Amino acid sequence: MRKLTRNYINLRGHQVWSAQGKTFGKKSEPVLLMHGGLSSTESWDYTVIPAVQRTHSVFAYDRSAHGRTASREGFYHFDFQTDEAIAYIEDAIKGPTHLIGWSDGGIISLMVALKRPDLVKSIVAIGTNYHFDSGLSLVEEDPEIVISEDDAAKFALRSPDPAHMQEVIIRKAYEVWNSEPTMTIAQLSRISCPVLVLTGDDEPFSNHHTIELYEAIPNARLAIVPGTSHFVVKEKSKIVQGLIKDFYRDLDYPITIWPRLRKEQTEKLKEK
């Protein structure tokens, strides 16, 4: 697997840990990897890079209060993270990009597509819920925070924030997850780019919620990987990589033999 070049960049006054892969000529389109919540780029990028490293120019960054990027005022709310993603796309990638987002990264990808559709070529949304009321309460309102020695050591090694901020960040994440995101079916129906909804069959949210997300987006595909959880990217990396490769091979609207959801659009396309 090709390594990414990793360094800090100044993103509109904030030092953000950024990663970039090799560019493969003019036909090599950018793809931005969006990590999950309370995570970082290096904790998951190796699971998906093999799917795109020979076909795309790979970009990634640690969001504020994640990985090697310090926290700042407003961090963790999804509107804040969406605006930060838009700034990164505009300033670092400098144009429209494909997005691959896991968990919170998938949420942010959908929100970027809603707020700035001109910047999004396609989305792979992995283990993504569109609303906090997703069929299962993920966290308690006032959870007891237990930080292992290993997690504390990783935070101290990576984060520019002082040690006490680790608990502050975790509590803020739980607070946000109990009230955000709040996307609606009507909003999702406005997403026009190709979307692959990729999920485990035993996510922390309901399968019904996943189906709602898939059926709401006009140009979406659905992949449910059997025998996996929210960590589908790590549990069955090869299958996930294959699904992503297949998605990128043909981003045109899917024409199938016996469509139901796609029947009306299929008939329109066949008339042309």
Model-predicted segments: where are they?
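Conserved alpha/beta-hydrolase "nucleophile elbow" surrounding the catalytic nucleophile
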Residues: 37, 101-103
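Flexible "cap/lid" loop of the alpha/beta hydrolase fold
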Residues: 107-115, 119-153
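Conserved HGGG/HGGXW glycine-rich cap/lid loop of the alpha/beta-hydrolase fold
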Residues: 14-68
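Active-site loop/oxyanion-hole signature of alpha/beta-hydrolase fold enzymes
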Residues: 46, 59-98
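Short beta-strand/loop motif that positions the catalytic acidic residue
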Residues: 191, 197-199
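Catalytic active-site module of serine/aspartate enzymes centered on a nucleophile-bearing elbow/loop
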Residues: 226-272
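Conserved alpha/beta-hydrolase "acid-adjacent" motif
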Residues: 204-209
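Active-site nucleophile elbow and catalytic-triad environment of alpha/beta-hydrolase enzymes
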Residues: 171-187, 201
